UniProtKB/Swiss-Prot annotation:
The modification Pyrrolidone carboxylic acid is found at residue 1. Tachykinins are active peptides which excite neurons, evoke behavioral responses, are potent vasodilators and secretagogues, and contract (directly or indirectly) many smooth muscles. Pfam families: Tachykinin. Its main location: secreted. Keywords: Amidation, Amphibian defense peptide, Neuropeptide, Pyrrolidone carboxylic acid, Secreted. The modification Methionine amide is found at residue 11. This is Substance P-like peptide 1. GO terms for biological process: defense response; neuropeptide signaling pathway; tachykinin receptor signaling pathway. InterPro entries: Tachy_Neuro_lke_CS, Tachykinin_dom. It comes from Pseudophryne guentheri. GO terms for cellular component: extracellular region. Belongs to the tachykinin family. Expressed by the skin glands. It is found in: Secreted.
Amino acid sequence: QPNPDEFFGLM
């Protein structure tokens, strides 16, 4: 499951 930190890092 993707971590929130990595998800925001893509944005």
